[in-house]
Amino acid sequence: MMSVTNNLKVTAGDGASKVSFCNTERFSLIAGPCQMESRDHAFMIAGVLKELCDSLGIGLVYKSSFDKANRTSLSGKRGIGLDSAMEIFADLKKEFGFPVLSDIHTEEQCAIVSEVVDVLQIPAFLSRQTDLLVAAAKTGRVINVKKGQFLAPWDMKNVLAKLNESGNPNVLLCERGASFGYNTLVSDMRSLPIMASLGAPVIFDATHSVQQPGGQGGSTGGQREFVETLARAAVAVGVAGLFIETHEDPDNAPSDGPNMVHLKDMPKLLEKLLAFDAITKA
């Protein structure tokens, strides 16, 4: 049986705020709302997640997007913008002492965002963009690269090589589903050990994996009810981390509402996932 056995460790953050990702150790969590909506909203979500993860002994990397650049509709809300988001991320780190993650879309953003953000995320649609990968790698920050929905898991060896050969060994490979016909994604759990075999900690994105791209005509749909199903399966296989977007009112969130987990449901979900994780890594 092929298993997720490489014990390579990648650590995000500085000093006491460090969070490690390793396929053979307890999973760490990347969580937060899809997009950064306001300072107050970011602090509210962050406070709840920090308290929860501290109580459960889970390492937390707080995530949020300053710009949702690939919205289905031109009128879709995209976020509060780069400058405002960097100020808020800096204040979140001071207040809560956790590393933060945000996605980047252009080479020019890499140097700016890396001054504050600990983990730079490469969106799935941009996972083969060489110039972006090289620019991100050269910042020296941890890179979380989403596997494109159009890529096989073994194709990520080329993505990983671009980052490593640009001088950055601190790479996380993230599974977020594969295209399966129109408006549908499926999660092939074989991809988790396959990507681990390439030499990187593996993250499973449990919320984007249940997206239905463009499934609501002018916006993306999702099947929130299957987040737990897929997360449990991934943890049973064994992963270094889970990526879960969450919101206190997902049905009215400005983006990705149909696939985000309700904030009030996070405690029970994480407790269940920890139980599976303990068995898998015993």
UniProtKB/Swiss-Prot annotation:
A GO CC annotation given for this chain: cytoplasm
Swiss-Prot/TrEMBL keywords: Cytoplasm, Lipopolysaccharide biosynthesis, Transferase
Localization, UniProt: Cytoplasm
Top-rank taxon, per record: Bacteria
Pathways involved: Carbohydrate biosynthesis; 3-deoxy-D-manno-octulosonate biosynthesis; 3-deoxy-D-manno-octulosonate from D-ribulose 5-phosphate: step 2/3; Bacterial outer membrane biogenesis; lipopolysaccharide biosynthesis
KW Transmembrane helix (keyword) present: no
Xref: InterPro entries: Aldolase_TIM, DAHP1/KDSA, KDO8P_synthase
GO MF entries: 3-deoxy-8-phosphooctulonate synthase activity
Main location: cytoplasm
Family of this protein: Belongs to the KdsA family.
Protein name: 2-dehydro-3-deoxyphosphooctonate aldolase
